[in-house]
């Protein structure tokens, strides 16, 4: 999505894809997705408003996944963790209820193997709320190189266990 919340796929092409993955938090693309000089509170607000905007669009949500909601694309360094932490439960609940109503999939892809315990809890909080609100999940490695796949099974097994995911929680296309 660009800074005007326009996704990079035109409606006439939706039918050409079995699955459409849309990242709402690529805020590291200064000038394209955001101004680039936002503070943590502004980035948290952008996280919410961009997901909300996506959920308002006329999309084939039965085959749309929202990519890597808790990754560093929100803000560099530890800023992304702070931004995720200051989003209220009420905002998460509102957004994930809407996601459930729309039928969109929520991607799980953070790397718990390289994340300390306190930070894992920051990552898990929105996903726990999403699960409570009835969202469905899919796994995405976001791998940019083959060696990344080496630990993915362990990673996803652990994330699924931490969230208590069952077959009924799967996003099925």
Predicted stretch roles:
Residues 1-102:
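Extended substrate/RNA-proximal surfaces in nucleic-acid metabolism proteins
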Residues 79-173:
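Charged catalytic cores and adjacent phosphate/nucleic-acid-binding surfaces used
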């Amino acid at each position: 999505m660009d800074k005007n919340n326009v996704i990079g796929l035109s409606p006439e092409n939706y039918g050409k894809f079995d699955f459409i993955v849309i990242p709402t938090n690529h805020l590291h693309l200064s000038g394209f997705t955001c101004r680039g000089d936002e503070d943590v509170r502004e980035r948290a607000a952008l996280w919410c408003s961009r997901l909300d905007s996506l959920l308002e669009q006329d999309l084939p949500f039965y085959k749309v996944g929202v990519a890597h909601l808790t990754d560093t694309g929100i803000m560099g360094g530890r800023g992304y963790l702070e931004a995720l932490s200051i989003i209220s439960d009420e905002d998460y609940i509102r957004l994930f209820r809407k996601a459930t109503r729309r039928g969109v999939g929520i991607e799980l892809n953070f790397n718990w193997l390289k994340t300390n315990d306190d930070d894992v809890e920051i990552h898990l909080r929105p996903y726990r709320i999403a699960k409570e609100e009835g969202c469905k999940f899919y796994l995405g490695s976001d791998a940019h190189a083959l060696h990344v796949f080496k630990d993915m099974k362990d990673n996803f097994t652990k994330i699924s266990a931490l969230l208590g995911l069952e077959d009924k929680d799967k996003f099925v296309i």
